[in-house]
């Protein structure tokens, strides 16, 4: 028990576990990565690791929360001169998420896991529900926070579907952006004219560059937040 208390108060061990898990999930995939391999690669005792994280889902749960926040900061920097354009922020951030999944099948797997498992999906929904209230309250004037939580369950289903299906020569990334944004913004009662404007603006950004900036910064972001 003393070891457990020590580990719980040792953020460096937790940070090392998360950084190592992130590298292994990206290199080998979520399913192929075991807790023992994470312990071995991180240099953290297996018993200490399982005290902090009882299973892989809890690790990916925390990682996805960090990735979501890292995405948000990337977009905040990109749109620092357009802070008042809340819908554009939402559109760029969600398309960035699609781009990250499109950049690697192992990243796609991590996102699919995060939207399908109970603990990690709750992190996603809780994290996003308050943002939805801030972004779309002008269009959803009768909604309370519980309504936005339920809305995020619906939007999460849309996101999961678009994440899961890879692009090909017919379903190009350009078409994925259009269909995704049309769907989610219509659900949020955004006017058609605004949707068209947002889609045109979003397509002007270099998402390959944004994906690289987000993923390159994730390891240092983990260190700074834990």
Go through each PLM region and give its residues.
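Short, Lys/Arg-enriched anionic-surface-contact patches
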Residues: 5-13
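C-terminal peripheral helix-coil segments that are non-catalytic and often amphipathic
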Residues: 133-142, 168-226
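Helix-turn-helix
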Residues: 16, 24-58, 62
């Amino acid at each position: 028990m003393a070891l457990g208390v020590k580990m719980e108060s040792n953020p460096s061990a937790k940070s090392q576990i998360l950084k190592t898990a992130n590298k292994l999930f990206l290199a080998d995939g979520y399913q192929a990565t075991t807790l023992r391999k994470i312990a071995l690669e991180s240099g953290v005792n297996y018993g200490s690791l399982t005290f902090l994280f009882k299973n892989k889902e809890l690790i990916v749960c925390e990682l996805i929360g960090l990735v979501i926040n890292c995405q948000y900061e990337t977009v905040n920097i990109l749109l620092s001169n357009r802070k008042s354009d809340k819908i554009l922020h939402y559109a760029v951030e969600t398309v960035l998420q699609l781009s990250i999944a499109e950049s690697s099948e192992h990243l796609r797997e991590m996102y699919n896991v995060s939207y399908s498992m109970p603990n990690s999906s709750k992190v996603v929904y809780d994290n996003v529900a308050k943002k939805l209230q801030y972004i779309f309250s002008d269009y959803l004037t009768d909604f309370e926070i519980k309504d936005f939580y339920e809305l995020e369950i619906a939007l999460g289903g849309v996101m999961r579907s678009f994440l899961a299906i890879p692009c090909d020569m017919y379903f190009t990334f350009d078409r994925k952006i259009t269909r995704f944004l049309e769907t989610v913004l219509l659900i949020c009662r955004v006017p058609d004219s605004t949707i068209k404007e947002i889609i045109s603006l979003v397509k002007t950004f270099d998402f390959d560059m944004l994906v690289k900036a987000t993923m390159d910064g994730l390891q240092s972001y983990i260190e700074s937040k834990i």
